[in-house]
Amino acid sequence: MRDRESALSRVDVGGGVYVETMTRDRARLIADIEAFEPFNEQESVDKQVILRALKSDSNCFERSAQAHMATSIWTVDASFERTLLEWHNIYQSWSWIGGHADGVADLRAVALRELEEETGVHGRILPYGCGIPVEGELVRGDGVLEGSNLPLEQDSSCEDSFARGFESFPRVDFRSNGGDVFSLEVLTVNGHEKRGAYVGSHLHLNVTYLAQANPDVPLKVKPDENSALKWVPLDDAVRLSSEPWIRDRIYRKLIAKTRAYCR
């Protein structure tokens, strides 16, 4: 059972009068999405849809909302050449990893938890923004700039033993934008059965994060969500998907953005 939080909090302003205020996590998410620079027209359009929901629907982090927040985690290895996929039981297709917000506005934490719960892998979310890799500079997995003893800012979710397992990867300068949001998409979900109950058609207001993980860590399926897991070359995410819209609109985009990230 996940810890739950209200996306809006009631604050006593005196005289028995209460007003609803945005939680810090919801406000941060809105700020990150507002700062996000769309990669294409799909992201530009969907960014506005997601922001409208975040600013107007206090229930958008709950599954009861017709359009509700969800998150995905596009997970790559240290070379940025392989990604981790699951065989999704409902979609009957090889798929990225993700899940519902379920009342939690910190979607970064939700994404990392979904990755661990559904695959057994600990991930490290990489900053995105509009950053450009700094030519010739590499960062070790423990967050130390090669040739220096000065640590870079470290993701608090990254365990020491996990971080030490990474090879070096390009240092990236994200001062032009900042934030961790890698991709945005509004996803349609057709009605389906889950755990013996019918779930009506709805929309996922999806925020995707880019993460790095160690492919040598043993994979563990989550039988109520998936039935197989594997690391594959980036382009195989397109080849293996049986969902045309996801394949052509999302996976091709994610692959292009991944390759642009580490140029």
Could you tell me what each predicted segment is?
Residues I246-R263:
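Charged phosphate-binding loop/patch that engages nucleotide di/tri-phosphates or the phosphate backbone
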Residues S79-E117, V121-R124, C130-I132, C158, ...:
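Conserved Nudix-box catalytic region and its N-terminal flanking loop in Nudix hydrolases
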Residues D32-S72:
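Acidic, metal-coordinating catalytic segment for phosphate/diphosphate chemistry
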Residues G99, A105, V110, V134-E137, ...:
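Polybasic/polar functional segments that serve as interface/processing modules
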Residues R2-R4, R10, R140, L150, ...:
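Basic polycationic patches enriched in arginine
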Residues T208, Q212-A213, K220-Y251:
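NUDIX/MutT-family hydrolases
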Residues G136-D155, D160, F169-V217:
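Active-site-adjacent beta-strand/loop module that shapes the phosphate/pyrophosphate-binding cleft
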